[in-house]
């Protein structure tokens, strides 16, 4: 008689790895039950928003050309505004990725002579060229927009004293990155973000507070826009696309700020009124509908990975028992060989391109070689099972995604299997 264990063995995972994983999984029932409760709340929130905005079959029709009359696009933006409790939203396939969405929001709302402040330290690597920390054509710095950052205190706490000193008459926009990116700091809870925004606005009430919400949507019952963020920004090939959106990004927030984003995305005088959806609306709506459940599966995978690798003695961020504020799990593996082996295991567990061997390469936007494992249906989708990391100290790998918990589990066990095969883990 066939059983689950036989399938894992047939797929190349040795019995010792399977048994070790089963032991860890058995300790996580309460954590998983709590995740399911959050997913249930967020599922109801999404359905309620779709009902309130009268989503109908006509929203899925193909629209081309200028897109002056694109009811699906306009309704989807109403749904996002309803979910995020904002005045407006811009949700478009013409926004190609999370970095594009962030660059758009910044460029649309900053002018020469303004200053951008990051009170949470260095931003994600790809934003360094957007801002001009690393020189790049078309950066904010080229347009006379200055940048200042305040690093976090040891342990990841906000440095309120230096944040207060950094805010000045030129400070126009404060950007807060919720997720850790390629760093080993903690990701921030919505509550922590709310406290930071309240502090910033107590010093300068008219400053724009923008939150990079990538990897954080639907992880908690509330979003940064519920605690004072003027704009929240993210990618549809992460959490809110539910694994079905083939491209896209969103910006939700104050109407005047979103209008500015529309003018920057298309053209002054045109704004949000143009930009046809080109037949992707059904996948955008359906992906959003599935997003709370898909995000829950990814969260379970992250917690499982944390507990597996923590038990083996590795440093993991967050640790196995900490609350979760995004879907990313960082594991400090200590050597380039271990990072590469981990990623090979993730790739081997993929439904697409499982036979491919990932290797480090000089990826545009990064200052070191990066290895990426992602046998995904949508290229670059990080809500699908994926892992990546820069080949530099502390040699940490960043695991995320899994459209289902079961697939995330397979990927994590396969990552461990590859470390065992390479002799990099010798005792379970």
Specify the residue positions occupied by each region the protein language model found:
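Conserved PLP-enzyme active-site core in the AAT-like
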Residues: 2-25, 36, 46-59, 67-70, ...
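A short, basic N-terminal segment
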Residues: 32-40
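Short glycine-rich or small-residue beta-strand-to-loop segments that form or flank ligand, phosphate
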Residues: 59, 63-64, 90-93, 327-332
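Flexible linker/loop signature enriched in Pro/Ser/Thr and Pro/Gly
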Residues: 83-86
């Amino acid at each position: 008689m066939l059983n689950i264990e036989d399938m894992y063995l047939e797929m190349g995972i040795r019995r010792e790895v399977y048994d070790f994983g089963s032991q860890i999984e058995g300790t996580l029932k309460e954590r998983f039950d709590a995740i399911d409760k959050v997913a249930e709340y967020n599922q109801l929130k999404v359905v309620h928003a779709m009902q309130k905005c009268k989503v109908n079959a006509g929203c899925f029709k193909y629209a081309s050309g200028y897109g002056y009359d694109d009811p699906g696009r306009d309704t989807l933006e109403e749904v996002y505004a309803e979910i995020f409790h904002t005045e407006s939203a811009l949700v478009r396939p013409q926004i190609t990725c999370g970095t594009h969405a962030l660059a758009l929001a910044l460029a649309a709302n900053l002018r020469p002579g303004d200053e951008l402040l990051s009170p949470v330290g260095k931003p994600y690597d790809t934003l360094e060229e957007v801002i001009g920390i690393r020189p790049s054509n078309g950066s904010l710095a080229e347009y006379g927009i200055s940048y200042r950052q305040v690093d976090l205190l040891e342990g990841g706490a906000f440095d309120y004293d230096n944040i207060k000193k950094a805010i000045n008459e030129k400070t126009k926009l404060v950007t807060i990155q919720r997720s850790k990116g390629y760093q080993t700091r903690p990701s921030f809870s919505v509550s922590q973000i709310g406290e930071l925004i309240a502090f910033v606005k107590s010093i300068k009430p008219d400053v724009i507070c923008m939150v990079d919400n990538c990897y954080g949507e639907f992880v908690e019952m509330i979003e940064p826009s519920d605690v004072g963020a003027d704009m929240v920004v993210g990618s549809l090939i992460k959490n809110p696309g539910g694994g079905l959106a083939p491209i896209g990004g969103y910006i939700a927030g104050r109407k005047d700020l979103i209008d500015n984003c529309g003018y920057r995305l298309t053209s002054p005088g045109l704004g949000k009124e143009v930009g046809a959806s080109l037949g992707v609306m059904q996948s955008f709506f359906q992906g959003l509908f599935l997003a709370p459940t898909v995000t829950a599966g990814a969260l379970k995978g992250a917690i499982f990975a944390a507990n597996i690798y923590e038990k083996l003695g590795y440093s993991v961020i967050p640790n196995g028992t900490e609350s979760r504020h995004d879907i990313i799990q960082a594991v400090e593996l200590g050597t380039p060989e271990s990072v590469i082996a981990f990623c090979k295991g993730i790739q081997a567990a993929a439904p697409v391109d499982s036979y491919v061997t990932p290797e480090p390469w000089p990826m545009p936007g990064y200052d070191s070689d990066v290895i990426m494992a992602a046998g995904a249906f949508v290229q670059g989708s990080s809500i699908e099972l994926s892992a990546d990391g820069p080949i530099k100290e502390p040699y940490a790998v960043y695991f995320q995604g899994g459209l289902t918990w079961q697939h995330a589990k397979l990927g994590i066990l396969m990552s461990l299997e590859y470390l065992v095969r390479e002799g990099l883990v010798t005792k379970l």
